[in-house]
UniProtKB/Swiss-Prot annotation:
It catalyses: tRNA(Arg) + L-arginine + ATP = L-arginyl-tRNA(Arg) + AMP + diphosphate. It comes from Pseudomonas aeruginosa (strain ATCC 15692 / DSM 22644 / CIP 104116 / JCM 14847 / LMG 12228 / 1C / PRS 101 / PAO1). Keywords: Aminoacyl-tRNA synthetase, ATP-binding, Cytoplasm, Ligase, Nucleotide-binding, Protein biosynthesis. The gene is argS. Its main location: cytoplasm. Its EC number is 6.1.1.19. GO terms for biological process: arginyl-tRNA aminoacylation. It is found in: Cytoplasm. Gene3D superfamilies: Arginyl tRNA synthetase N-terminal domain (3.30.1360.70), HUPs (3.40.50.620), Isoleucyl-tRNA Synthetase, Domain 1 (1.10.730.10). InterPro entries: aa-tRNA-synth_I_CS, Arg-tRNA-ligase, Arg-tRNA-synth_N, Arg-tRNA-synth_N_sf, ArgRS_core, DALR_anticod-bd, Rossmann-like_a/b/a_fold, tRNAsynth_Ia_anticodon-bd. One of its GO terms (molecular function) is ATP binding. A motif ('HIGH' region) lies at residues 127-137. Signal peptide: none annotated. This is Arginine--tRNA ligase.
């Protein structure tokens, strides 16, 4: 709908330019937003206020000319001027109702991509191997997964790339420790965190051990068979730990999506050679660097992008450049999204620029760093254990499930006291599992991607507010309507007719699902979908309270309200699925 309004405004601008009301050459960014109060229309634009000065007119006078010039359209009932010159657009209720009927009949809820389908590479999760995943890996994993799901829903071909850290100093450290502990090492490997900490302690405390670790890295990189065999074993165990976390989280990542740093080893020397051939490299204290004038330090000197150390080793930038070239040459990506901590913003700005100057990627290939903030504890600092250690992600998820189970068990006892049929233990465990995992994921996804946030079990497990339990309950409330009806959602007759204010408000929200999904895909911001679903659930609650469904006054009204309820249920479920959340029929 917003795109339609933008097109209508553009047609009006073209007409006013042709008749001399507006000067030629104006290319305004036409903004169309939802109104805060639907009594003032469904959508609003400030285009008249934007162009009043170049037009030499008062905003309201220009707004009046625009209203006259905007073509009639079946989706619009009227356009009004408000305040200092806003244009308020009112949807046609008959058209709106018909569009919702079409959405209900469509398995995709009427959602289509605004633009051609693309091949999109999603770089997500990407933990360093040789130790277990910790809470710091949560955001990249679930935000990337949600955006990947949205893009697939819109028809893009999505290629997930888990760019794991499977190469480097940490493996030399582990190999050296394995030499010292040959008897117990295999057993200790099953608790990678314990094994890694022990090796890191030796590395930090013993210069001899550190030197041996570096020697083993060189042997590993040279292809030593024994080192490669042990390195492979470390990776297998580490990746199996990762897969358990992914399965627990319900994210769409598998071993087939792993494309670690080591996959690009054979191309790193060629990357350096190609940068040299392009004349982009400068030697600085023995290291090979690219200096970009756009990125300077506090003294005004260009910052280096180091691609090869003085000792011959390669860095993250070298691997990232090789990966970009692979993603263009082999994966044929139109767009690459990097879900990496926003503290790496400068790194990505630099390597993106180097890749383009070197010709590793074409100008039309989109490279986007989807940075995110930090998950903090209640004290506002990075989330840690009580003794200051990192929190294993699997431990966090287990605690979430345990807390959720205790919560739903208590509610189940209250259910029995009210004389309602209680859930059995198997059902309670499943409900607790879904509520626990969904709550952790939703609490994160509902925050703006670039914002830091404080992790709080009590808030995220609440059945009030913008939480997973609240939305899960909204889904079960819709499902209960059709259980009482004794009929499936797919068997409904009649058509939607919008009469009451609550029906209109719910319908207007449902109609915006497609625009919303496209916006999430464009910006990589799942919190917009969370906010939409939360508002939708609230509007359904108001509709449910004020507009009797099963006891409606006449059959046509009953059919209409059942259809609105059915579309609401499907939209909630589809939205939660796109976020990577499970839903429940009852809870």
């Amino acid at each position: 709908m917003k795109d339609t309004i933008r097109q209508l405004i553009q047609q009006a601008l073209d007409q006013l330019t042709a008749d001399g009301t507006l000067p030629a050459g104006l290319t305004p960014d036409i903004q169309v937003e939802n109104t805060k109060d639907r009594s003032h229309g469904d959508f609003a634009s400030n285009i008249a206020m934007m162009l009043a000065k170049p037009a030499g007119m008062k905003p309201r006078d220009l707004a009046a000319r625009l209203v006259e010039a905007i073509p009639a359209h079946e989706q619009l009932a009227k356009v009004e001027i408000a305040g200092p010159g806003f244009l308020n657009f009112f949807q046609d209720h008959v058209w709106l109702a018909a569009s919702l009927d079409r959405a209900l009949a469509d398995e995709r809820l009427g959602v289509r991509k605004a633009g051609p389908a693309q091949r999109v590479v999603i770089d997500l999760s990407s933990p360093n191997l040789a130790k277990e995943m910790h809470v710091g890996h949560l955001r990249s994993t679930i935000i990337g997964d949600a955006v990947a799901r949205v893009l697939e829903f819109l028809g893009d071909t999505v290629i997930r790339q888990n760019h794991v850290g499977d190469w480097g100093t940490q493996f030399g450290m582990l190999l050296a420790y394995l030499e010292e502990q040959p008897v117990d090492a295999e057993a200790e490997l099953h608790d990678l965190e314990v094994f890694y900490r022990a090796a890191k302690k030796r590395f930090d405390e013993s210069p001899e051990f550190a030197d041996r670790a570096r020697e083993l890295v060189v042997k590993l990189q040279a292809g030593d068979p024994d080192c490669l065999r042990l390195w492979t074993r470390f990776n297998e165990i580490s990746l199996s730990h990762c897969q358990k976390v992914y399965d627990r989280l319900g994210v769409k990542l598998s071993m087939a999506d792993v494309m670690g740093e080591s996959a690009y080893n054979d191309d790193l020397a060629q990357v350096v050679a190609d940068l040299t051939a392009k004349g982009l490299l400068t030697e600085d204290n023995g290291a090979l660097c690219v200096f970009l004038e756009e990125f300077k330090n506090a003294e005004g000197n260009p910052l280096p992008v180091i691609v090869q150390k003085a000792g011959g080793g390669y860095l993250y930038a070298t691997t990232d450049l090789a990966a970009m070239r692979y993603r263009h040459n082999v994966l044929h990506a139109d767009r690459v999204l990097y879900f990496v901590d926003q503290r790496q913003a400068l790194h990505f700005q630099q390597v993106f620029e180097v890749a383009r100057r070197a010709g590793f990627v074409p100008a039309g290939m989109e490279l986007e760093h989807m940075g995110f903030g930090t998950m903090n504890g209640a004290d506002g600092r990075p989330f840690k254990t009580r003794d200051g250690g990192t929190v294993k992600l699997i431990d966090l998820l287990e605690e979430a499930e345990s807390r959720a189970y205790a919560l739903v068990k208590e509610r189940n006892e209250q259910r029995a006291e009210r004389g309602e049929e209680p859930f059995d233990e198997v059902q309670l465990r499943e409900i607790g599992r879904v509520v626990g995992i969904d709550s952790v994921k939703y609490a994160d996804l509902s925050k703006h991607r670039t914002s830091d946030y404080s992790f709080n079990f009590e808030l995220m497990l609440s059945f009030e507010g913008n939480t997973a339990p609240y939305l899960l309950y909204a889904c079960t409330r819709v499902a209960s309507v059709f259980r009482k009806l004794g009929q499936g959602r797919e068997q409904l007759g009649g058509k939607i007719v919008l009469e009451q204010p609550q029906e209109l408000a719910l319908a207007a929200q449902l109609a915006q699902f497609g625009d919303l999904i496209n916006n999430v895909a464009l910006k990589g911001v799942p919190h917009l979908l969370c906010a939409y679903l939360y508002e939708l659930a609230g509007l359904f609650s108001s509709f449910y309270e004020h507009c009797p469904i099963l006891t409606a006054e006449d059959p046509a009204q009953k059919d209409s309200r059942l259809r609105l309820a059915a579309l609401t249920g499907r939209t909630l479920e589809q939205g939660l699925e796109l976020l990577g959340l499970k839903t429940l029929e009852r809870m």
